[in-house]
Regions:
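N-terminal Lys/Arg-rich, disordered targeting/topogenic segments
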Residues: 1-9
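Hydrophobic membrane-insertion alpha-helices, especially the h-region
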Residues: 14-29
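...with weaker cross-activation on analogous glycine-rich loops/strands in unrelated enzymes
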Residues: 148-251
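Low-complexity, Gly/Ser/Thr/Pro-rich intrinsically disordered linker/tail segments
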Residues: 240-293
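Intrinsically disordered, low-complexity regions enriched in polar/acidic and amide residues
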Residues: 9, 35, 44-47, 176, ...
Length: 293
C-alpha cells in the first residue's frame, strides 16, 4: 500500500459512516412524522385503551377510568367500592404510610406539628389524607416529614384525584349511591364519632388481634367530647398506639406513643382496651380496607 492510499481509505470509511448516520436520522424523522409519535395501544369499541390495567388506569384519575370502576357499595357501609384498596400491596402501603405519618407527629418538635392537629380525630384525618397522597419531593417539602426508608405509594388511586375530590370522609348515614359524590354525603372534616360510625367498621374487641393502621375507639361518658381514638402501630416491633390527648381544661393536648402493655395497665381503667371495659368500643378498621371485590 502506498503512503497516499491509507488516508484515502480512511476518508471513504468516514464518509460512509456519516452517510449511514444521516440515513438513520431521516428514517426516524419519517417514522415520527407519519406515525405522529403514537404508541400502538389496542383500544376497546368505546375508544378506551384496553392495554391499561384497571389499577393503572385509575391512578390517572380520568373521567373514563373512574367510569369503569364499581360505583357500588358491597358492604352497605357508605363507602364506594371504587375507593376500597383490594390489592394487598396497596393495603400494606396505606397502613405503612398511615402509621408512619401519625408516629412522626409524635416525635417531631411540637412547633413543627401541623396546626390542624389538635385532638385525636384531627390526627386520624391528617394521617389518613396524607397517606393517600402522592409522596414526591413536593409532598416532603410541604409536610416537613423525613424518612429513612420510604414505602411504596398506593397505586389504585391517590387523593384528591377521585370523583369525591377533596371530600374524603363519609358524613351522612346510609349506603353509597352514585349521587353521593356530589350531594354533600362526603366532606373534608369528620369528628371522631363520624369517623367511627361512617368511615370504619368493628373488627374485634380483642386488642391482641389489632394490626398496624387499625384504630381503637373509646366513648368516655360524661365528657364534653366523649369520643376518642388511637392508632395502632409498632415501636421496635412491639405493639403500641399513638394518639393526641386533646385539649384539657383549656390546656392544649399532646401527642403520645405508648406501648400496648402499658396501655393495658393504664392507671385509669376506662382507658384500658379490654372487653370488660364498657368505655372501650373495640378495634376498628378503615372502610377502604374492608374485604375484596
Amino acid at each position: 500500500m502506498t503512503p497516499k492510499a491509507k488516508p484515502r481509505k480512511q476518508s471513504v470509511i468516514l464518509v460512509t459512516i456519516v452517510a449511514l448516520a444521516l440515513a438513520l436520522l431521516l428514517l426516524r424523522m419519517f417514522v415520527f412524522v407519519h406515525g405522529q409519535g403514537r404508541r400502538g395501544i389496542r383500544r376497546t369499541q368505546s375508544g378506551q385503551p384496553a392495554a391499561l390495567s384497571t389499577v393503572h388506569a385509575a391512578s390517572y384519575g380520568t373521567a373514563a377510568s373512574w367510569a369503569r370502576q364499581p360505583w357500588s357499595d358491597r358492604f352497605g357501609d357508605g363507602t364506594p367500592d371504587f375507593l376500597r384498596l383490594t390489592d394487598p400491596a396497596d393495603q400494606a402501603a396505606f397502613r405503612q404510610w398511615f402509621t408512619l405519618i401519625a408516629e412522626y407527629q409524635a416525635i417531631r418538635p411540637k412547633a413543627e406539628i401541623p396546626t390542624e392537629i389538635t385532638d385525636c380525630a384531627s390526627l386520624l384525618r391528617y394521617s389518613y389524607r396524607e397517606a393517600l397522597k402522592r409522596h414526591d419531593d413536593t409532598w416532603f417539602v410541604a409536610t416537613g416529614i423525613e424518612l429513612v426508608a420510604m414505602p411504596g405509594d398506593v397505586r389504585a388511586w391517590r387523593y384528591p384525584e377521585t370523583p369525591l375530590g377533596a371530600a374524603l370522609f363519609r358524613i351522612k348515614p346510609g349506603a353509597f349511591e352514585p349521587e353521593d359524590a356530589t350531594n354533600g354525603a362526603f366532606a373534608q372534616f369528620a369528628d371522631a364519632k363520624t369517623l367511627v360510625e361512617r368511615n370504619a367498621y368493628l373488627v374485634t374487641r380483642d386488642v391482641r388481634q389489632a394490626q398496624p393502621g387499625d384504630l381503637l375507639f373509646y366513648r368516655q361518658f360524661g365528657q364534653s367530647s366523649p369520643w376518642h381514638s388511637m392508632i395502632v402501630m409498632r415501636i421496635a416491633g412491639q405493639p403500641a398506639v399513638v394518639y393526641d390527648t386533646g385539649e384539657d381544661h383549656g390546656k392544649s393536648g399532646e401527642l403520645r406513643r405508648v406501648l400496648l402493655p402499658e396501655l393495658l395497665d393504664h392507671p385509669q381503667p376506662q382507658w384500658r382496651p379490654i372487653p370488660g371495659n364498657p368505655n372501650f368500643l373495640g378495634v376498628y378498621r378503615w372502610n377502604i380496607l374492608r374485604g375484596t371485590l
